[in-house]
């Protein structure tokens, strides 16, 4: 259904887009890499400007995680270019990641980025997509609230750690109030496994269903 929000665990819809770096096909052009697609309401607006600067300041950290950034709004490509030039000239920050020019709003509608009572501008959405093109996380912010880049980076790191180690990630990781930077071991699936887990020196446990370890 047009406008339906794609779901976590689904493949990111295949879309051909025009960007400030030329034409691209998502998710195909990012196969083998993670990518974060984030939409913003409009160019030449204060909150969006702070977000773009914040994303750029952390761009190297994303790339060290094999993760690319790509922005999107319902603006024409020349508007993106002029805004990026303004950011470089006035703020001394060069935006290095591509920005999708969705001037007709077709991609935004397909991804469910236009919400009721918000006109034709997109909300502040974040899609985290893995190297296989699967959507792993979706976050929506209202137009009035800028995003926290630390949390987006944390989510990417957490998903990658979960995939690599087969573990779950606690709240506020890696500074959790109970287990600090440890990760949660999946619960035991049998009585015998639960007993062995409590006796194991590989984990620390509050109980058989709540065990954790360092990674």
Curated annotation (Swiss-Prot):
<keyword id="KW-0575">Peroxidase</keyword>
<dbReference type="GO" id="GO:0140824">
    <property type="term" value="F:thioredoxin-dependent peroxiredoxin activity"/>
</dbReference>
<keyword id="KW-1015">Disulfide bond</keyword>
<feature type="binding site">
    <location>
        <position position="124"/>
    </location>
    <ligand>
        <name>substrate</name>
    </ligand>
</feature>
<dbReference type="GO" id="GO:0045454">
    <property type="term" value="P:cell redox homeostasis"/>
</dbReference>
<dbReference type="InterPro" id="IPR045020">
    <property type="entry name" value="PRX_1cys"/>
</dbReference>
<comment type="function">
    <text>Thiol-specific peroxidase that catalyzes the reduction of hydrogen peroxide and organic hydroperoxides to water and alcohols, respectively. Plays a role in cell protection against oxidative stress by detoxifying peroxides.</text>
</comment>
<keyword id="KW-0676">Redox-active center</keyword>
<comment type="similarity">
    <text>Belongs to the peroxiredoxin family. Prx6 subfamily.</text>
</comment>
<protein>
    <recommendedName>
        <fullName>Peroxiredoxin</fullName>
        <ecNumber>1.11.1.24</ecNumber>
    </recommendedName>
</protein>
<feature type="active site" description="Cysteine sulfenic acid (-SOH) intermediate">
    <location>
        <position position="48"/>
    </location>
</feature>
<dbReference type="Pfam" id="PF10417">
    <property type="entry name" value="1-cysPrx_C"/>
</dbReference>
<dbReference type="InterPro" id="IPR019479">
    <property type="entry name" value="Peroxiredoxin_C"/>
</dbReference>
<keyword id="KW-0049">Antioxidant</keyword>
<dbReference type="InterPro" id="IPR036249">
    <property type="entry name" value="Thioredoxin-like_sf"/>
</dbReference>
<dbReference type="InterPro" id="IPR050217">
    <property type="entry name" value="Peroxiredoxin"/>
</dbReference>
<comment type="subunit">
    <text>Homodecamer. Pentamer of dimers that assemble into a ring structure.</text>
</comment>
<keyword id="KW-0560">Oxidoreductase</keyword>
<dbReference type="InterPro" id="IPR000866">
    <property type="entry name" value="AhpC/TSA"/>
</dbReference>
<dbReference type="GO" id="GO:0004601">
    <property type="term" value="F:peroxidase activity"/>
</dbReference>
<feature type="disulfide bond" description="Alternate">
    <location>
        <begin position="205"/>
        <end position="211"/>
    </location>
</feature>
<dbReference type="InterPro" id="IPR013766">
    <property type="entry name" value="Thioredoxin_domain"/>
</dbReference>
<dbReference type="Pfam" id="PF00578">
    <property type="entry name" value="AhpC-TSA"/>
</dbReference>
<keyword id="KW-0963">Cytoplasm</keyword>
<dbReference type="GO" id="GO:0005829">
    <property type="term" value="C:cytosol"/>
</dbReference>
<feature type="domain" description="Thioredoxin">
    <location>
        <begin position="6"/>
        <end position="161"/>
    </location>
</feature>
<dbReference type="InterPro" id="IPR024706">
    <property type="entry name" value="Peroxiredoxin_AhpC-typ"/>
</dbReference>
<dbReference type="InterPro" id="IPR022915">
    <property type="entry name" value="Peroxiredoxin_TDXH"/>
</dbReference>
């Amino acid at each position: 259904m047009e406008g339906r929000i794609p779901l976590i665990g689904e493949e990111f819809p295949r879309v051909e887009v025009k960007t400030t770096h030329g034409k691209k096909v998502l998710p195909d052009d990012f196969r083998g890499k993670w990518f974060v697609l984030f939409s913003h309401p409009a160019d030449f607006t204060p909150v969006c400007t702070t977000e773009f600067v914040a994303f750029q300041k952390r761009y190297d950290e994303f790339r060290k995680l094999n993760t690319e950034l790509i922005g999107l709004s319902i603006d024409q490509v020349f508007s993106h270019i002029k805004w990026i030039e303004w950011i470089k000239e006035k703020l001394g920050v060069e935006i290095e990641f591509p920005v999708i020019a969705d001037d007709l709003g077709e991609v935004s509608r397909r991804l469910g980025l236009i919400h009721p009572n918000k006109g034709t501008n997109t909300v502040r959405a974040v899609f985290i997509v893995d190297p296989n093109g699967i959507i792993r996380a979706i976050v929506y912010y209202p137009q009035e609230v800028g995003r926290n880049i630390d949390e987006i980076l944390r989510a990417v790191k957490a998903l990658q750690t979960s995939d690599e180690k087969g573990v779950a990630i606690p709240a506020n990781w890696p500074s959790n109030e109970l287990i600090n930077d440890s990760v949660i071991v999946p619960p035991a699936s049998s009585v015998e496994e639960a007993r062995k887990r409590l006796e194991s020196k590989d984990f620390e446990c509050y109980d058989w269903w709540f065990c954790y370890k360092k990674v």
